[in-house]
């Protein structure tokens, strides 16, 4: 049975539940549940603190886990676990920040104190850049550290930047890490059931980005129409009772759907229909 670690709370928890549910896996109904067995799919889910997931997978206690790339890298378990799929949600950036106007470059941090909850990420960055600064560990609310005299700057995960702005801070220097939700796996032989999980998750990600389009068009306009709707590989073309007409089915990217419909209508297509894709295997 495949053992999967899932965030039990926080920004990643709900999105992780949704993608797994769309992939056909049972999910807990009570947030107090710590373990859920899905016998039909031969999977066991363990609901853990997002920060601990990489540790459990890295030690081989659990097979795979859904967590943030920032948390995975911060745990420093790359030798015993690996990132195998980006999941496209929970995007953020690990950045340096300080009160507005304090610093303009990371080079100005030499000999200064940097507060963070991501010691592993920050130490790796300092080592990579050769920057000599003191790391001050805090479990959270690092924005207050400068005002309270504990640090001169902070290194933290930034999503919208609203929290920093409210604290009178701004980011500076380069982006240290671009993060998003990822699937990680323990090192060594791939566990049984992982390939099915990967196919299902990939199918959900594709289904979220694409829609199905159906339309009728005159046979002599088919080439022009299919140039607008080439699909992933090739559109499906079916004859109609009226031999001068054909029916076309293809996949188009969801953000392009209305533009494509307009172009097809202008070409002469009619009966243009968009439908959602709930699952797909490629």
Swiss-Prot record:
EC numbers on record: 2.4.2.17
Domain of life, per lineage: Bacteria
Cited InterPro entries: ATP-PRT_HisG_long (IPR020621), ATP_PRibTrfase_cat (IPR013820), ATP_PRibTrfase_CS (IPR018198), ATP_PRibTrfase_HisG (IPR001348), HisG_C (IPR013115), N-reg_PII-like_a/b (IPR011322), N-reg_PII/ATP_PRibTrfase_C (IPR015867)
Activity regulation: Feedback inhibited by histidine.
Pathway the protein takes part in: Amino-acid biosynthesis; L-histidine biosynthesis; L-histidine from 5-phospho-alpha-D-ribose 1-diphosphate: step 1/9
Gene designation per UniProt: hisG
NCBIfam families with a match to the protein in the record: hisG, HisG_C-term
Subcellular localization: Cytoplasm
Cofactor needs: Mg(2+)
Family: Belongs to the ATP phosphoribosyltransferase family. Long subfamily.
GO biological process: L-histidine biosynthetic process
Keyword Zinc: no
Gene Ontology CC: cytoplasm
Keywords, ordered alphabetically: Amino-acid biosynthesis, ATP-binding, Cytoplasm, Glycosyltransferase, Histidine biosynthesis, Magnesium, Metal-binding, Nucleotide-binding, Transferase
Enzyme class of the recorded protein, top EC level: transferase
Entry GO MF terms: ATP binding; ATP phosphoribosyltransferase activity; magnesium ion binding
HAMAP family named among the record's database cross-references: HisG_Long (MF_00079)
Entry function: Catalyzes the condensation of ATP and 5-phosphoribose 1-diphosphate to form N'-(5'-phosphoribosyl)-ATP (PR-ATP). Has a crucial role in the pathway because the rate of histidine biosynthesis seems to be controlled primarily by regulation of HisG enzymatic activity.
Protein's recorded name: ATP phosphoribosyltransferase
Catalytic activity: 1-(5-phospho-beta-D-ribosyl)-ATP + diphosphate = 5-phospho-alpha-D-ribose 1-diphosphate + ATP
């Amino acid at each position: 049975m495949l053992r999967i670690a899932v965030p039990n709370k926080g920004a990643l928890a709900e999105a992780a539940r949704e993608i797994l549910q769309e992939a056909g896996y049972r999910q807990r109904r009570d947030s107090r549940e710590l373990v859920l067995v899905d016998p039909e799919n031969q999977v066991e889910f363990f609901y853990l603190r997002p920060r601990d997931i990489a540790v459990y997978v890295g030690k081989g206690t659990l097979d795979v886990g859904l967590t943030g790339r920032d948390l995975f890298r911060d745990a420093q378990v790359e030798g015993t676990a690996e990132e195998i799929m980006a999941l496209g949600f929970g995007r953020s950036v690990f950045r340096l920040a300080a009160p507005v106007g304090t610093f303009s470059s990371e080079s100005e941090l030499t000999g200064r104190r940097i507060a963070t909850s991501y010691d592993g990420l920050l130490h790796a960055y300092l080592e990579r850049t050769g920057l000599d600064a003191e790391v001050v560990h805090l479990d959270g609310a690092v924005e207050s550290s400068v005002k309270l005299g504990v640090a001169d700057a902070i290194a933290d995960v930034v999503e919208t930047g609203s929290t920093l702005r409210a604290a009178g801070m701004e980011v500076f220097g380069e982006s240290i890490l671009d993060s998003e939700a990822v699937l990680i796996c323990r090192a060594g032989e791939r566990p049984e059931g992982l390939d099915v999980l990967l196919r299902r998750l990939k199918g959900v990600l594709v289904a979220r980005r694409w829609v199905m389009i159906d339309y009728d068009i005159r046979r002599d306009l088919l080439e022009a129409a299919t140039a607008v709707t080439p699909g992933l590989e090739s559109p499906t073309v079916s004859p109609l009772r009226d031999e001068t007409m054909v029916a076309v089915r293809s996949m188009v990217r969801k953000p392009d759907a209305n533009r494509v419909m307009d172009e097809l209508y202008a070409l002469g297509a009619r009966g243009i229909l968009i439908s959602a894709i709930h699952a797909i295997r490629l």
